[in-house]
């Protein structure tokens, strides 16, 4: 059995620090190696834009090899903040953060990184559209309709306001100094800068692109690798950027290939076609480890698997039915049967890293497995056995199909009639046509504060509310408290109340288990897996 490691993050606040496509790994004389990585999916939206592709699969291909922020996440360490494109930062006040840029950083097009690029990366044109820096109000796609091919996709401004609800703008103090101005106080500004989305792009490349799509399929960034070739739904090849500020990249190319079936990823790895095979379910670990010259690395990560409810469904509009569904699931049985005990059932939508900021709610737990209580709640609700649709993807998440089948059987034993509807992609999952019911999802802690994922995913501009799956007025009021209050005790009290609302009184979701990632690889490769979806191929994580 693989050891499961837990990583704790640093605090949020103040810190200083100073095209040939190769089918497999090749060692040529005087040349760096290249690797091929089999993944279940490269991106969901067929773009390489961090704001448009906010996904687990996106994390894998984006970080830390391609996109970089002013503050970076310590992917191979405690997942806390480390200096990136900024060398130092300081608070001016509760609403203002100043950062000094690293000098001499080159973009992939040869331009030097300056304050102008940072200002642009958080501008209305690049990110916020016609939105205003006000929290607590849901922004829908229909509020932002592009009128030209150069404008942002309708969803992006609302996604931007998930992470930056009150950012009023970024000011260039001089060529290498910027100030972030928030409309409200925010104790998590530093954390938001190393969260998924806050990475920096080149202004000139955006201006020169003929359309948003052209830009988004080959963004110009500062990372150690740049886009060589991108074939949506097929492959992505990143090539070394030898002018990288952090030193010469160790690989010539990183090629991600889309291989949806687990068996095909495993067989391709063992045959030598691939150097890495991602998202292996635990029942495949022994197969890979038994083969000479191969190993599996993995751990739990800062992501929880959840199932979420659509309250426009007449049956699920009744919170008693949703509560019944949460008490009908034996989470530990799922962990034991499908994960071989290699992950855990967390205490609701909480992560151990919240303890570093004293925001962890002790004594809280996921809903207990209690089929009798579930049956009693259904009786109180007057449930008559009508079908509840369960839109399901085929193993987008590890073990997803098997997990869905197990849950349907558990619901059946409690008297719930849940019917699986297999879908091919996320567009079909979210299709407003037809009747929605329950679906799978996951929730990530991008920083060590519950503003992610509680507010960013379930608050007024979380996907749940933007897609009109669920809403709760008190939850939205508390989201503003979590986003704007500088009173730590008040913030913690608000978070505790959010858990009560979202997991007990008016369920938006139910947490199933902490996610874990397992990657099969050639044992000869001197590389270590991060406790994340991300795969680090920088020089400090690759040796020959």
Task: For the regions a language model picked out, list residue spans one by one.
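Long beta-strand-rich cores associated with HINT superfamily self-processing modules
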Residues: 521-544
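Gly/Pro-rich hinge or "lid" segments in bacterial periplasmic/extracellular proteins
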Residues: 57, 74-76, 154, 164-165, ...
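Structural transition elements
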Residues: 344-380, 395-402
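Extracytoplasmic/peripheral linker and loop segments enriched in polar/acidic and small residues
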Residues: 170, 320, 335, 367-368, ...
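Ligand-site clamp/hinge motif
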Residues: 124, 213-216, 241-287, 417
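Periplasmic binding protein-like
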Residues: 37-38, 110, 276, 403, ...
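N-terminal lobe/hinge region of extracytoplasmic solute-binding protein
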Residues: 38-93, 123, 218-221
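Periplasmic-binding protein-like
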Residues: 190-192, 286-287, 312, 316-355, ...
């Amino acid at each position: 059995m693989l050891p499961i490691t837990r990583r704790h993050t640093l605090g949020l606040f103040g810190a200083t620090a100073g095209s040939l496509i190769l089918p497999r790994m090749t060692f040529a004389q005087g040349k760096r190696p290249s690797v091929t990585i089999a993944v279940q999916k490269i991106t969901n939206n067929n773009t390489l834009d961090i704001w448009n592709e906010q996904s687990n699969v996106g994390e894998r291909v984006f970080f830390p090899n391609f996109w970089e922020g002013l503050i970076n996440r310590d992917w191979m360490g405690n997942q806390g903040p480390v200096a990136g494109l900024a060398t130092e930062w300081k608070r001016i006040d509760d609403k203002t953060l100043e950062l000094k840029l690293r000098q001499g950083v080159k973009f992939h097009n040869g331009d030097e990184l300056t304050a102008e690029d940072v200002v642009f990366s958080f501008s209305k044109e690049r990110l916020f559209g016609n939105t205003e820096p006000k929290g607590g109000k849901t922004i829908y796609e229909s509020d932002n309709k592009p009128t030209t091919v150069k404008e942002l996709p309708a969803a992006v401004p609302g996604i931007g306001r998930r992470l930056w609800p009150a950012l009023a703008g970024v000011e260039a103090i001089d060529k290498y100094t910027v100030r972030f101005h928030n409309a409200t106080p925010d104790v998590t500004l530093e954390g938001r800068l190393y969260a998924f989305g806050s990475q920096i792009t080149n202004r000139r490349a955006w201006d020169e692109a003929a359309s948003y799509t052209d830009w988004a399929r080959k963004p110009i960034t500062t990372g150690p690798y740049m886009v060589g070739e991108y074939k949506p739904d097929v492959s992505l090849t990143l090539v070394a950027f030898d002018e990288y500020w952090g030193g010469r990249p160790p690989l010539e190319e990183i090629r991600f290939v889309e291989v949806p079936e687990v068996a095909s990823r495993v067989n391709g790895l063992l045959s030598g076609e691939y150097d890495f095979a991602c998202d292996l379910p635990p029942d495949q670990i022994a197969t890979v480890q038994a083969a000479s010259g191969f190993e599996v690395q993995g751990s739990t990560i800062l992501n929880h698997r959840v199932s979420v409810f659509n309250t426009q469904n007449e049956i699920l509009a009744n919170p008693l039915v949703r509560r019944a569904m949460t008490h009908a699931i034996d989470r530990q049985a799922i962990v034991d049967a499908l994960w071989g005990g290699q992950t855990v059932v967390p205490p609701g939508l909480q992560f151990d890293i919240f303890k570093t900021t004293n925001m962890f709610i002790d004594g809280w737990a996921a809903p207990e497995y209690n089929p009798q209580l579930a049956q009693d709640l259904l009786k109180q609700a007057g449930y008559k056995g009508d079908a509840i649709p369960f839109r399901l993807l085929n193993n987008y998440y590890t073990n997803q199909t098997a997990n869905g089948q197990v849950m349907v059987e558990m619901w059946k034993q409690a008297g719930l009639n849940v019917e699986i509807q297999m879908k091919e992609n996320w567009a079909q999952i979210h299709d407003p046509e037809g009747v929605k019911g329950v679906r799978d999802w996951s929730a990530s802690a991008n920083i060590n504060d519950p503003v992610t994922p509680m507010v960013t995913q379930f608050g007024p501009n979380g996907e749940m509310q933007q897609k009109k799956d669920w809403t709760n007025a008190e939850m939205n009021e508390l989201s503003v408290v979590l986003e704007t209050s500088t009173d730590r005790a008040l913030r913690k009290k608000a978070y505790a109340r959010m858990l009560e609302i979202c997991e007990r009184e008016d369920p938006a979701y139910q947490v199933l288990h902490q996610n874990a990632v397992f990657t099969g690889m050639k044992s000869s490769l001197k590389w270590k897996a991060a406790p994340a979806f991300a795969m680090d191929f920088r020089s400090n994580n690759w040796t020959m």
